[in-house]
Protein backbone atom coordinates (compact mmCIF):
# COMPACT_ATOMS: atom_id res chain seq x y z
CA UNK A 1 0.00 0.00 0.00
CA UNK A 2 1.16 3.54 -0.78
CA UNK A 3 -0.05 6.94 0.39
CA UNK A 4 0.24 10.21 -1.50
CA UNK A 5 -0.66 13.78 -0.63
CA UNK A 6 -0.42 17.17 -2.31
CA UNK A 7 -1.52 20.75 -1.80
CA UNK A 8 -4.76 19.81 -3.61
CA UNK A 9 -6.26 16.52 -4.78
CA UNK A 10 -8.95 16.49 -7.46
CA UNK A 11 -11.15 13.40 -7.13
CA UNK A 12 -14.01 14.31 -9.51
CA UNK A 13 -16.33 13.43 -6.60
CA UNK A 14 -16.76 16.86 -5.05
CA UNK A 15 -14.57 19.85 -4.34
CA UNK A 16 -10.76 19.47 -4.33
CA UNK A 17 -9.28 18.08 -1.12
CA UNK A 18 -6.79 20.46 0.47
CA UNK A 19 -3.82 18.37 1.64
CA UNK A 20 -5.87 15.18 1.43
CA UNK A 21 -4.42 11.68 1.28
CA UNK A 22 -4.79 9.13 -1.52
CA UNK A 23 -4.16 5.48 -0.62
CA UNK A 24 -3.40 3.00 -3.40
CA UNK A 25 -2.67 -0.69 -3.51
CA UNK A 26 0.66 -1.88 -4.90
CA UNK A 27 -0.50 -1.77 -8.54
CA UNK A 28 -1.67 1.85 -8.23
CA UNK A 29 -5.41 1.26 -7.86
CA UNK A 30 -6.93 3.93 -5.63
CA UNK A 31 -8.37 2.44 -2.45
CA UNK A 32 -9.41 5.64 -0.70
CA UNK A 33 -9.30 9.42 -0.75
CA UNK A 34 -9.15 10.98 2.71
CA UNK A 35 -10.25 14.54 3.41
CA UNK A 36 -7.98 15.90 6.15
CA UNK A 37 -9.74 19.27 6.15
CA UNK A 38 -6.42 20.81 5.15
CA UNK A 39 -4.80 19.66 8.41
CA UNK A 40 -2.32 17.11 7.14
CA UNK A 41 -0.18 15.51 9.83
CA UNK A 42 3.16 13.82 9.16
CA UNK A 43 2.94 10.05 8.64
CA UNK A 44 5.58 7.43 7.99
CA UNK A 45 5.66 6.49 4.30
CA UNK A 46 3.46 9.39 3.13
CA UNK A 47 4.73 10.83 -0.16
CA UNK A 48 3.94 14.56 -0.36
CA UNK A 49 3.93 16.55 -3.62
CA UNK A 50 4.00 20.34 -3.64
CA UNK A 51 1.43 20.59 -6.41
CA UNK A 52 -1.81 18.85 -7.32
CA UNK A 53 -2.88 15.25 -7.86
CA UNK A 54 -5.49 14.69 -10.56
CA UNK A 55 -7.17 11.62 -12.10
CA UNK A 56 -5.68 10.25 -15.30
CA UNK A 57 -6.65 11.81 -18.61
CA UNK A 58 -8.64 10.21 -21.44
CA UNK A 59 -7.53 10.79 -25.03
CA UNK A 60 -10.69 10.13 -27.02
CA UNK A 61 -9.18 10.45 -30.53
CA UNK A 62 -5.73 9.22 -31.47
CA UNK A 63 -3.99 7.68 -34.52
CA UNK A 64 -0.94 5.90 -33.09
CA UNK A 65 -0.02 4.17 -36.35
CA UNK A 66 0.21 7.56 -38.09
CA UNK A 67 2.53 9.09 -35.47
CA UNK A 68 5.49 8.87 -37.86
CA UNK A 69 3.74 11.11 -40.38
CA UNK A 70 3.58 14.22 -38.20
CA UNK A 71 4.67 17.17 -40.34
CA UNK A 72 5.07 15.07 -43.51
CA UNK A 73 1.65 15.59 -45.09
CA UNK A 74 0.79 19.06 -46.42
CA UNK A 75 -2.58 20.52 -45.51
CA UNK A 76 -5.20 21.84 -47.91
CA UNK A 77 -5.51 18.79 -50.16
CA UNK A 78 -8.88 17.64 -48.89
CA UNK A 79 -9.73 14.21 -47.51
CA UNK A 80 -8.93 12.35 -50.75
CA UNK A 81 -5.47 13.91 -51.00
CA UNK A 82 -4.84 13.29 -47.31
CA UNK A 83 -5.72 9.58 -47.60
CA UNK A 84 -3.63 9.22 -50.78
CA UNK A 85 -0.61 10.77 -49.03
CA UNK A 86 -1.02 8.49 -46.01
CA UNK A 87 -1.17 5.38 -48.16
CA UNK A 88 1.81 6.36 -50.31
CA UNK A 89 4.36 7.56 -47.72
CA UNK A 90 3.78 5.48 -44.61
CA UNK A 91 6.52 3.09 -43.57
CA UNK A 92 5.53 0.32 -41.14
CA UNK A 93 8.91 0.14 -39.34
CA UNK A 94 9.19 3.91 -38.91
CA UNK A 95 5.54 4.02 -37.83
CA UNK A 96 6.13 1.38 -35.13
CA UNK A 97 9.01 3.37 -33.64
CA UNK A 98 7.01 6.61 -33.76
CA UNK A 99 3.96 4.88 -32.23
CA UNK A 100 6.08 3.64 -29.33
CA UNK A 101 7.37 7.18 -28.75
CA UNK A 102 3.82 8.55 -28.94
CA UNK A 103 2.58 5.94 -26.44
CA UNK A 104 5.31 6.92 -23.98
CA UNK A 105 4.59 10.62 -24.47
CA UNK A 106 0.86 10.08 -23.85
CA UNK A 107 1.57 8.15 -20.64
CA UNK A 108 4.09 10.73 -19.42
CA UNK A 109 1.46 13.44 -19.96
CA UNK A 110 -1.07 11.61 -17.77
CA UNK A 111 -3.18 9.67 -20.29
CA UNK A 112 -4.54 6.43 -18.81
CA UNK A 113 -7.19 5.57 -21.43
CA UNK A 114 -7.02 6.15 -25.19
CA UNK A 115 -9.40 5.54 -28.09
CA UNK A 116 -7.11 4.82 -31.04
CA UNK A 117 -8.33 4.92 -34.64
CA UNK A 118 -6.39 2.36 -36.66
CA UNK A 119 -6.34 1.02 -40.22
CA UNK A 120 -4.12 -2.01 -39.59
CA UNK A 121 -2.96 -4.20 -36.72
CA UNK A 122 0.43 -2.43 -36.64
CA UNK A 123 -0.02 -1.04 -33.10
CA UNK A 124 -1.89 -3.94 -31.48
CA UNK A 125 1.18 -5.53 -29.87
CA UNK A 126 2.37 -2.16 -28.54
CA UNK A 127 -1.05 -1.58 -26.96
CA UNK A 128 -1.00 -4.92 -25.14
CA UNK A 129 2.28 -3.95 -23.44
CA UNK A 130 1.42 -0.31 -22.74
CA UNK A 131 0.56 1.13 -19.34
CA UNK A 132 -2.32 2.91 -21.11
CA UNK A 133 -5.62 1.08 -21.63
CA UNK A 134 -6.51 1.30 -25.31
CA UNK A 135 -9.75 0.91 -27.19
CA UNK A 136 -9.00 0.25 -30.88
CA UNK A 137 -11.46 1.70 -33.37
CA UNK A 138 -10.99 0.18 -36.83
CA UNK A 139 -11.20 2.58 -39.77
CA UNK A 140 -11.63 0.90 -43.12
CA UNK A 141 -10.17 2.75 -46.12
What spans do the regions from the language model cover?
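N-terminal metal-binding scaffold of metallo-dependent hydrolase/deaminase domains
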Residues: 1-41
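Short, glycine/charged-enriched secondary-structure capping and boundary segments
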Residues: 18-19, 72-75, 129-131
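Conserved beta-strand segments of alpha/beta enzyme cores
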Residues: 29, 44-45, 133
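Active-site loop-helix segments enriched in His/Asp/Glu that coordinate
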Residues: 90-141
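Short, flexible, glycine/charge-rich loop motifs used to bind or transfer phosphoryl groups or to couple energy/partner
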Residues: 11-13, 37, 48, 104, ...
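Catalytic metal-binding/acid-base residues of hydrolase active sites
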Residues: 9, 63, 119
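Active-site gating loops and adjacent loop-to-helix segments of metal-dependent hydrolytic enzymes
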Residues: 66-98, 135-138
Amino acid sequence: MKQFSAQFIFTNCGPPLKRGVITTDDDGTVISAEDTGGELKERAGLEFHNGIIIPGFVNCHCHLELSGLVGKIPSGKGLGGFIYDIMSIRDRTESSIAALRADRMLFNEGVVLCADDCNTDATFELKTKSRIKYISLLEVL
